[in-house]
UniProtKB/Swiss-Prot annotation:
It comes from Blochmanniella pennsylvanica (strain BPEN). One of its GO terms (biological process) is L-leucine biosynthetic process. Its main location: cytoplasm. HAMAP family: LeuB_type1. Pfam families: Iso_dh (PF00180). This is 3-isopropylmalate dehydrogenase. InterPro entries: IsoCit/isopropylmalate_DH_CS, IsoPropMal-DH-like_dom, Isopropylmalate_DH.
Length: 366
């Protein structure tokens, strides 16, 4: 078994650097417990790179990412860079560029609501008796975000804008296969989202997914229109297992579901390619308003490194170890401010990182 791994660490902007520091605490414990050599090297990305090197995605950063087994990403963007557009902006010039360069076509976003946090959900707890345990499988490099042509034309009252939604059969097949295989390891149910009563891309999407489902007879498939799916997620989120989405629909629905779970600060994200190379990041943004105040929730970032171990390094036992420590911290009542109830004591970013690292370490020593 390979015991040597290289991880490119891109802390970025806002709360990215401080939550990254908490992940290092976890990695230090894991390295000692499992006797594996994990080499982490930090590189600049996003606004941080713009300030120091004049570009959101330096060539030196790309070079090291190409030499690594996976990328641990923080966050990019902030008010001082909002005037920058297109490839000069932190978001498009860095994050979208990484996705495109490494063909990270599959975005996996687990949405999990722990029993201890049910009261934080905007939904009545009677609507979620079985909690929420969903994985969004979102196609990430096709659809209307990337289709050409797009732009603006005309003048005055005749000015107009246009975007093009395009999906190829192979793009749908590869993302659907990931969804079905994940479902086989879970509750064996896939909900595929489209708008096949209107959009030609959705008609092809439904056709391809239905055909592939024949290869997975043990998995139940249902098709839902996007508008119906958005209602069902509010009405009965517990019914969902794997939600398979085109790019735009997945972007919208996963954020809706993130709020149902109580706090986006709890949610990790993985973007992977066909070779299991991936970029792992918290689902939330850079949150510049709370940066360096030691109040950001590092759990999403810590769970992201768990996903990195699971999907890119194929070390599922380590991923489970990290996830159990997070669950234990919550059961013991530890809360950052975003998941603390009114009048409930909260702990800092650094304290949460220390506690989760200690729980991993102590379990080994028992």
């Amino acid at each position: 078994m390979n015991n040597n791994y290289h991880i490119a660490v891109l802390p970025g902007d806002g709360i990215g650097p401080e939550t990254t520091r908490q992940v290092y605490k976890i990695l230090n414990v894991i390295k000692k417990q499992f006797q594996i050599n994990i080499v982490t090297t930090e590189h600049k990305i996003g606004g941080d790179a713009i300030n120091s090197e004049g570009t959101p995605f330096p060539k030196s950063t790309l070079k090291y990412c190409e030499q690594s087994n996976a990328i641990l990403f923080g966050a990019v963007g902030g008010p001082q860079w909002t005037h920058l557009k297109g490839s000069e902006s932190p978001e498009q010039g860095a994050l979208l560029a990484l996705r495109k360069h490494f063909n990270l076509f599959a975005n996996l976003r687990p949405i999990y609501l722990a029993d201890e946090l049910k009261e934080l959900s905007p939904l009545n707890i009677n609507m979620i008796p079985n909690g929420i345990d969903i994985i969004f499988v979102r196609e990430l490099t096709g659809g209307i975000y990337f289709g050409q042509p797009k732009g603006r034309s005309g003048t005055g009252l005749n000015e107009y804008a246009f975007d093009t939604a395009v999906y190829h059969r192979f793009e749908i097949e590869r993302i659907a296969n990931i969804a079905f295989k994940l479902a086989q390891k879970r509750r064996k149910r896939v909900s595929s989202i489209d708008k096949a009563n209107v959009l030609h891309t959705s008609m092809l999407w439904r056709e391809v997914v239905s055909h592939l489902a024949k290869n997975y007879p043990d998995v139940e498939l249902e098709h839902l229109y996007i508008d119906n799916a958005s209602m069902q997620l509010i009405n009965n989120p517990s019914k969902f297992d794997i939600i398979l989405c085109p790019n735009l629909f997945g972007d919208i629905l996963s954020d809706e579901c993130a709020m149902i779970s109580g706090s986006i600060g709890m949610l990790p994200s993985a973007s992977i390619n066909e070779h299991n190379f991936g970029l792992y990041e918290p689902a939330g943004g850079s949150a510049p308003d709370i940066a360096e105040k030691n109040i950001a929730n590092p759990i999403a970032h810590i769970l992201s490194i768990a996903l990195l171990f699971r999907y890119s390094l194929k070390l599922d036992h380590i991923a489970i170890k990290i996830e159990k420590a997070v669950s234990q911290a919550l059961m013991l009542g530890y809360r950052t401010i975003d998941i603390a109830k009114k009048h409930e004591k909260s702990i800092s970013t650094n304290e949460m990182g220390d506690i989760i690292a200690a729980l991993i370490k102590n379990e080994r020593e028992k």
